[in-house]
Design a protein with these regions (language model features):
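A short coil-to-beta-strand element that immediately follows conserved catalytic motifs
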Residues: 79-89
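Short, well-ordered beta-strand micro-motif
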Residues: 33, 104-108, 127
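Conserved Nudix-box catalytic region and its N-terminal flanking loop in Nudix hydrolases
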Residues: 35, 39-75
Length: 156
């Protein structure tokens, strides 16, 4: 696990340096997915120590809405209709000289099936007031905005 984590971090830093040098921006799509009990879905990747909102990068020519529908299906086995995807907020984030624009959606209606992703080590549902300790800082801020009605920030 440590080798995969270290390899990912090195590859990610190299990629971000190249993107920065080329002046590229990136766009990502993530979702606050809630269930009927009011719990939120979080994922833990094989290459990161924290819990995150599910989602990922937007492919060339793909809309952010299509990206979150695809990512939820690939990562956690959720099937979401386009009409059940509601925009929450768009943020700006800089990492290693690259501007990233995470787009967050709210998902309340979906069906699920068993999915296996090499990227996801663990997925779990949590009540907002019982989140695990290792939630990423950005994820925690987004959940505060949604569940505690904290002001929505512009920066990730």
């Amino acid at each position: 696990m440590k080798i995969i984590n270290c390899s990912y971090q090195i590859a990610n830093r190299v990629l971000k340096r190249v993107q920065s040098w080329m002046g590229l921006n990136t766009v990502g799509a993530r979702a606050i997915v809630t269930n009927a009990d009011g719990k939120v879905l979080l994922v833990k990747h094989t290459y990161q120590p924290h819990w995150y909102l599910p989602g990922g990068g937007v492919k060339n020519g793909e809309s952010t809405k299509a990206a979150i529908i695809r990512e939820l299906h690939e990562e956690v086995g959720l099937i979401v209709s386009e009409q059940d995807v509601a925009l929450f907020a768009i943020y700006q984030h800089s990492y290693l000289g690259v501007n990233d624009y995470p787009v967050i959606y709210i998902i309340k209606n979906y069906t699920s099936h068993i999915a296996y992703s090499r990227e996801i080590e663990q997925m779990a549902w949590f009540y907002y007031d019982e989140l695990p300790e290792m939630v990423s800082p950005g994820t925690k801020r987004r959940l505060n905005e949604y569940f505690a009605n904290a002001p929505i920030a512009e920066k990730w």
